[in-house]
Each structure stands twice: as C-alpha cells, then as structure tokens.
C-alpha cells in the first residue's frame, strides 16, 4: 500500500504543517467522503462546514484559512493546485501505448510518421498527413489529408480531424471531438439555402485540450484559430473563423458564433451563447447561461440572458423579486391618492 507522512506531502507541495506531521496518509478523497488515513482539500468556502464533520486525517487549506478544528492541516497558497500534486502520488500509473501501427489501421500515401508514434486499431490516416514524434492516435480516429499533427499529441478514440487541419504539440482531443467540419454558411437564393463553400482550415496551437463531442468548424476562408493553452470542455460549438485567445477556458455547452474573437485569459462558463462578429476582451468572464450580443471590454464580468455587468444583473434580480410587493404598494398608493381613477383591467401577478 502506498503511504506518505503529512510531513512528506507538505514538503512536496511547499506547504506548512499545522498539527501532527507524522500521520500516515494512504489515500485521497473529497471532503465529504474522506475516511481515516485519507487526505482531502478545501478551496471553496461553501464546504467549510464540512471540516467539522470530515473523517479525513488531514486537509490541504489556504494559508489564510481560520480553523477551530483539531484536524491536521497543510497550509499552501493554492489548495486545489497542491492537491492535484498529491493526487498524482496515489493515482494509478497512466496507461502506456506501444509504439507502432496496428495492422487494421489504414495509412494513406506519402504519410510522414515520427518516432515512437502509436496508431491504434482501425485508425484512418489519409494522404500526406504528418504526425510528430510520440503521438498516440486512438482507435477509429480519422485524420484527413494534408493535416499536420505536432509531437506528443494524444487523440482518444473516435476523434475526427478533417483535411488540412493544423494541430500543435501536446494537444489532447477527447472522444468524439470533431475538428474542421464545414462552417454553417448558407445564402438564400430564390427561396433556397445555397451552401457557401468552406475552404479555410482549423489551427490549434500547443497545449490545447478539447473535450468530448466538441466541434470546431473550419474557416469559410482563412482559419478558425484556438491559441496556445486553451482548455475547452465537452459539447462546445465553435463556429467558422472564431479566434480564441491564449489560455482561455470554456465550459460545457457553450456556443460561439462565426467570426467572433476572444482575447487572452477569457472565461466562458457553462451554456454561454456568443453572437457572431463581436470581440470579448482580455480577461473577461461571462457567467453561466449568459447571452452576449455586443463587444465586451477587457476584464469585464457579465451575467444574464442579456449579458450585463454582473453587479447590475444582481440589482435587477433583486428588484425583479420585489415586483409583486411593489405592485401591491402601488395599488394602495393609487387608491389613497386617486380614489376615483380607473383601475388596471388585469393584475399581471394573478392573471
């Protein structure tokens, strides 16, 4: 059984022990389910009450956290990041993939395959594809002709990469991701929707990770561009000619319409909808289920169906919840000061 002392774990993450440094830790868990011998972490204030109830032997917390519990703590700058390092000690070893080409894989003409590449069963690699050193191409992956794949990229099963795509180094694509499908472009002619040719490409830079069943459409011309370090969740739709700036993060079920650009370090929470041909400034945050229809300045935090500054959205929500009370007060005032004036024909809160 793998075990480490609290002191050893604190040394690994650069933390300070508060409590018993020699306690042996044999596993990891979340704060609600942790048992004796396990270590957990606290980064979200919502779970502070769980500290008093957890059975964990130790907790990784922030340096500023104030505790009245006798439980042993490891104080660090970032509990989540530190706990990620600890997880790696107790996690199973990652699977290794034997280099080579499975006999069921189909390899086209003039394909260039680097060193230590693993191509799994039933993968299809079309003509003139270039694959860098150390890549893993999962089962049933399709890579279209003239695409270029950077070294140490990892494509899980059933990834589709259409022709002429440009994929950087250390890119991770999860199952069902589709890169380079046609953009949604049509022109109405004589009452019919005529397809507009989509002749651009998709460029994905180094260290990008894209979740399961996410789709990135090729440019109408030019390119759809996901820049270095972006992390994109499952079930995201990225339309033609979108540009996503470095180190941006996009949560599930978000949709970005064509020719919109995001600056660097932008955060889009779940189910955000972004209109086309607008720009989201560097460092902006859009909260869940917001709809954005116009440019967003740098570092703005927007929220709501019609995305507004988040403080304004909160004020409007408070006022909205008070409308029934305000309506009753208004009726009483009207009755008091305008006793003979006609009343509204319908009460919007009881009709």
Curated annotation (Swiss-Prot):
EC number, UniProt record: 2.3.1.191
Recorded catalytic activity of this chain's protein: a UDP-3-O-[(3R)-3-hydroxyacyl]-alpha-D-glucosamine + a (3R)-hydroxyacyl-[ACP] = a UDP-2-N,3-O-bis[(3R)-3-hydroxyacyl]-alpha-D-glucosamine + holo-[ACP] + H(+)
Cystine connections: none
Any one annotated GO CC term: membrane
Active-site residue list: 240
Encoding gene (name): lpxD
Pfam families from the UniProt entry: Hexapep, LpxD
Name of the protein in its database record: UDP-3-O-acylglucosamine N-acyltransferase
Top enzyme category: transferase
One MF term in the entry's GO annotations: N-acyltransferase activity
